[in-house]
Structure formats: structure tokens, C-alpha cells
A protein has these predicted regions:
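Short, flexible, surface-exposed loop segments at domain boundaries
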Residues: 2-35, 50-89
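Short, basic/aromatic beta-hairpin or loop at an interaction surface
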Residues: 32-44
Length: 89
């Protein structure tokens, strides 16, 4: 039986940049200076890559996000300090 590391490195989609999460008030997410709507089926991932409900998500922090074709937030990843450092290189 193979055992995965407890906190394996996450793979993110290409062409995404770190942004600053400034607030979550379902169904809206404030990222940098813009307010987006969370897409139907949109997912927020915490630093352990678990899906969290919008009301349980941190209100601030560094994130990566992906938009759907309508401009809604489809996926949002809360970043760890290590990921922030790695993406800043």
C-alpha cells in the first residue's frame, strides 16, 4: 500500500497569479479591488486542499483563483506561505 504525504505539493492551473483575498460574503468574493460572484458549483480550497464552505473560508489572505467563462470565481485556492514564496520566484 502506498501512502501519500500529509501535505503534498499542490498543482495549480497555468497562467494564474497570486492575488489578495479581501472578503468573502456568499455569493460574493472580494479579490484585490474587485468583487466577483462565486460560480454555481464554485469551490474554495483551504491550505490543506480541502473544500471549505464560503462562510468557513478565511476573509483575507493570498489566493489563486480561476474564473469561469461568465467571469465568476470557479476555483479559489488559499495559499500557504511556502506556496506564496514559490509562486513569487
Amino acid at each position: 500500500m502506498l501512502i501519500a504525504p500529509a501535505h503534498a505539493e499542490r498543482n495549480f492551473p497555468p497562467n494564474v497569479k497570486p492575488a489578495e483575498l479581501r472578503g468573502v460574503e456568499y455569493p460574493y468574493v472580494r479579490i484585490d479591488d474587485r468583487t466577483y460572484r462565486l460560480a454555481p458549483g464554485g469551490r474554495i480550497y483551504d491550505t490543506f486542499n480541502r473544500i471549505v464552505l464560503p462562510n468557513a473560508a478565511p476573509k483575507t489572505g493570498k489566493v489563486l483563483f480561476k474564473l469561469d467563462p461568465q467571469g465568476n470565481v470557479l476555483k479559489l485556492w488559499i495559499l500557504t506561505p511556502e506556496e506564496i514564496a514559490r509562486l513569487s520566484q
